[in-house]
């Protein structure tokens, strides 16, 4: 387990709205997180948005947020909300079921 409360790590919840479902956004997010060495998860939401939690070194999490703002090649990001996520985030980065 990876604690976001460690001084060298942060965790952020990222909520992305726009054309982000049916355009490989989740798979792309998993690829980006793996490239950056982040822990967390991503899932579709019933309202058509995508939600993710990313945890790791601050500079890498901030880079993930920047990449989510740009979006995957086929997506269109209209807005993004980011907030701190306290607690423990499991190791690895996975896709979760839609909620």
From Swiss-Prot:
Its EC number is 3.6.1.7. It is an enzyme of class 3 (hydrolase). GO terms for molecular function: acylphosphatase activity. InterPro entries: Acylphosphatase (IPR020456), Acylphosphatase-like_dom (IPR001792), Acylphosphatase-like_dom_sf (IPR036046), Acylphosphatase_CS (IPR017968). The keyword Hydrolase applies. Residues 11-97 form the Acylphosphatase-like domain. It comes from the Bacteria. Keywords: Hydrolase. The active site is at 26, 44. It catalyses: an acyl phosphate + H2O = a carboxylate + phosphate + H(+). Belongs to the acylphosphatase family. This is Acylphosphatase. It comes from Rhizorhabdus wittichii (strain DSM 6014 / CCUG 31198 / JCM 15750 / NBRC 105917 / EY 4224 / RW1) (Sphingomonas wittichii).
